[in-house]
Amino acid sequence: MNSMLNFTHKRKSVSRLLAPVALAVILAGCSSSNQQQASASNITAIATDTSANYLIKAESSDGIESIDWNILALKALIKEGQWTQADNQSKRLSRMSLSPIQMAEWQLARATLRYQQGQLQEALNTLNFQPWWPLPDNQYKRYFMLRAELLGQLGQHSKAARQRTMLDQYLPSNQKNANWQNLWQDLSSYNNSQLQSVSLKEDETVLRGWIQLSILKNTYSQRPVRLKSAVDEWLSMNPYHPAHQYLPTELEAIMSMEVAQLDNVALLLPLTGRFESQGKAVRDGFINAMLDDTSRDTDTELTVFDTEAESMTAIMAKLQANGTQFVIGPLRKEKVTAFQQSNTSQINLLALNQPEQLDVSQTQSCYFSLSPEQEAEQAAQHLFAKGHQYPLVLAPKSKFGQRMTDAFNEQWQQLTGRNADIDTFGSRKQIQQQISRIFGLNDSQARISQMNQLTGVKLESQQRSRRDTDAVYLIANKSELTLLKPFIEVAINPEVKPPKLYASSRGNPNANSDNSELRGIEFSDIPLIINPELSFMERFDSLWPNESNTSIRLHAFGMDAYKMVNELPQLRVVDNYTVQGMTGQLGIDNQCVVQREMDWAVFTSDGITPAAE
């Protein structure tokens, strides 16, 4: 088995840390740490008085002092939102003879005004400090900060990043991290080709380093372990780069993964009793994937326990005595709960089922199952993505059917704010009558008969079915589908566009069965069934001949359980990280419940074919 990683909580990437509006307010009058009040000798401080008072002071003074008061009046007008008056005041100042500090403050104020007016390019053009100006750090700080923000919003992210490298020297230590995180966000807008084309001067070593790190991140975005190694190597070769102290949050999460070699893992499954066949199929899939893994550590010890043959207390005692580091299973919900209650040693767990209520204190536990509820939720997402607006869900009148329809409807409500139409069917004998009722044929026939009696004239009216339904999601096995499909087709008014029929994987029980009666129905299933790897399936059929699709799904489930043991820590750390498995595209939610995105196919006269996206 490959090197394993300890679990860590998923870290969210940092969004831009300084909102434009907040920045504009700051730049209208940059505060010092002691909130120094503006005076004629300190035009760089906050304008705390009204513009009217500043203008009065300007009129009553001369020379440099008068200009100072006029600059403070401009800053106050911007702060007050008096943009027309601020424009006029800015023009007045442009005709005055300004010192470098006054010129810099005027540029900053005028750029802030254009920024707040939404004139980003004009604001940027305004900022043009000259290198020979002897200016205080306060002004340089605001100059580079505003230029970086403007360039970023104008889509010139590499130039924005360059401004942030120059800004760093003017920032106090408690503001440096936010600046470097914003620089990282600027570079994250680029792919590797764009990053490699950025023109750099020889002395821009800091910016070059950030670009190199960003290229590594892009290159290994789906290979977190390799990314960790590459960043480690880069840091060792660049010991003085600020990334050592201010590593971007997403890279920090990667670096927090601790590689730990697992020597001892256990598989807990029902290998006797009622669930024997399911347990053995999962076991065979797990071991199959393990043997196929050429990069695994051959010294890893795997122990398989039969959860039906001994108590969980006895199994737990053996796990602790053996020094087991990771458990896969159990398969039954009640056994999962029993394991967690006995797990005083905090052994990492990938449960192969999900209890009704997740225990949030079980931070070392993740959950993976072939959840029919997840399949129903995905069906709602799939129908919504296909543009359907009024789906009807038909399910068996049972607890299982209720769970499936509830899952579909909850997802549909989240997507549309509306409930889906839901109905049930019973025994095979009742299906035709129930379909007629569901699609309104019985009511329609009754209305026609009533009109005939009232008028005494035979009406040539056709029975009308519901017109709004544009899709039907059928939660049914194959025999039920075989009955439902023709009855629905008969019930639909021929003048109305028939609803598209969809089904769950329950309707696809056997790879070799005749599905011609189901042609046209689109259904969800695992990739191994919809897009099988021929070489793998040939080997599978030779080892386990004539297996049903149910057994194939369980075998694939076992294979993916093995894959997830290696991938879980990366899934927990890297946002939007997914893995292609035999049962679907695999990711996790914030409770470490594995989410499966299944494939879709269509029944045809010749079998099944992948559905068009």
UniProtKB/Swiss-Prot annotation:
Naturally occurring in which organism (per UniProt): Photobacterium profundum (strain SS9)
Complex formation: Interacts with PBP1a.
Lipidation, S-diacylglycerol cysteine type: C30
Descriptive protein name: Penicillin-binding protein activator LpoA
UniProt GO MF annotations: enzyme regulator activity
InterPro entries, per database record: LpoA, Peripla_BP_I, TPR-like_helical_dom_sf
UniProt key word Signal: yes
HAMAP family according to UniProt: LpoA
Upper lineage: Bacteria, Pseudomonadati, Pseudomonadota, Gammaproteobacteria, Vibrionales
Family statement drawn from the similarity comment of this UniProt entry: Belongs to the LpoA family.
Membrane topology: Lipid-anchor
